[in-house]
Curated annotation (Swiss-Prot):
Substrate binds at N13, N66, G76, N77, N164, N197, E215, R216, G225, T226. One of its GO terms (cellular component) is cytosol. Belongs to the diaminopimelate epimerase family. InterPro entries: DAP_epimerase_AS, DAP_epimerase_DapF. The record marks H166, E215 as: Could be important to modulate the pK values of the two catalytic cysteine residues. It comes from Microcystis aeruginosa (strain NIES-843 / IAM M-2473). Its main location: cytoplasm. Catalyzes the stereoinversion of LL-2,6-diaminopimelate (L,L-DAP) to meso-diaminopimelate (meso-DAP), a precursor of L-lysine and an essential component of the bacterial peptidoglycan. This is Diaminopimelate epimerase. The keyword Isomerase applies. It holds the Pfam family DAP_epimerase. The keyword Cytoplasm applies.
Length: 281
């Protein structure tokens, strides 16, 4: 079997996009996705995204396998790439075009903008311990600057779910964080029963922050859209930033707005096609 695909990237967070509109189940298995994502023996990517038929009054369904074969609820950079991929499939990239996309995190609505930008309505953040989920606090409590012991040190963490779990820590010197070694310690900490994404953040100004991310199931990546959203929510809740903020990641910048009017988080950033190909299974 030969699988046509298009490689996309959003701020260096890269994905293999597959046209799966004719079937409600992914064309390939999680194990096959791992092989495709291998950067030495495969195509190379942080994940494989499938454009499946819509359900529950949506236009499309998004499924994604991470590079380790796990399946996350949603991916912010990935859904921007999916929106551009759908526009290419439909041969309609009109500015302002929106799609209702079913994900495991609920319905997400991306909108095409000029210059290959996509704005995504990421929905409202979830803040309770039971929603993250985490056992760090009671299920009815929020996790705001709560100590978490990792590697013998107490880190003040704020937890947010953007449909997937995030553990945010604010630091004074982002470059000093040994992300490759400490990231997996946070991800697999026993207080996170479904594991967690991990963000370390340095606040530069109330409207500008820098972050590095260890993604659940993917490790260090150049960008994480849901992570950037979670960072702005966490920073605002702890008095560190404005509702509109630029978040700088290793791969570039995202514009994040946590609306006071409707409590929803909006993310704007690029998504670009890299190349097309056919992968033999």
């Amino acid at each position: 079997m030969k699988i046509p695909f298009t490689k996309y990237q959003g701020l260096g967070n890269d994905f293999i996009l597959i046209d799966n509109r004719h079937s409600p189940e992914p064309l390939i298995t999680a194990e096959m996705a791992v092989a495709m994502c291998d950067r030495h023996f495969g195509i190379g990517a942080d994940g494989v995204i499938f454009a499946l038929p819509g359900q529950a009054e949506t236009d499309y369904t998004m499924r994604i396998f991470n590079s380790d074969g796990s399946e996350p609820e949603m991916c912010g950079n990935g859904i921007r790439c999916l929106a551009q991929f759908i526009a290419r499939l439909e041969a309609n990239n009109a500015i302002g075009r929106t799609y209702r996309i079913h994900t495991l995190a609920g319905t997400i609505i991306p909108r095409l903008e000029a210059n290959e930008q996509v704005t995504v309505d990421m929905g409202p953040p979830q803040l309770l311990g039971s929603e993250i989920p985490t056992t760090l606090v009671k299920g009815s409590e929020k996790v705001l600057a709560v100590p978490l012991e990792v590697e013998g040190k107490d880190w003040l963490v704020t937890c947010v779910s953007m449909g997937n779990p995030h553990c945010v820590t604010f630091v004074g010197d982002l470059a000093s964080i040994p992300l490759e070694t400490i990231g997996p310690k946070f991800e697999h900490h026993p207080v996170f029963p479904q594991r967690t994404n991990v963000e370390f953040v340095e606040v530069i100004a109330p409207d500008y922050m820098k972050m590095r991310v260890w993604e659940r199931g993917a490790g260090i990546t150049l960008a994480c859209g849901t992570g950037a959203c979670a960072v702005v929510v966490a920073a605002l809740l702890t008095g560190k930033c404005d509702r509109r903020c630029t978040v700088e990641l290793p791969g570039g910048c995202l514009q994040i707005h946590w609306s006071q009017t409707d409590n929803r988080v909006y993310m704007t950033g690029p998504a670009k096609a890299v190349f097309e190909g056919i992968y033999p299974i």
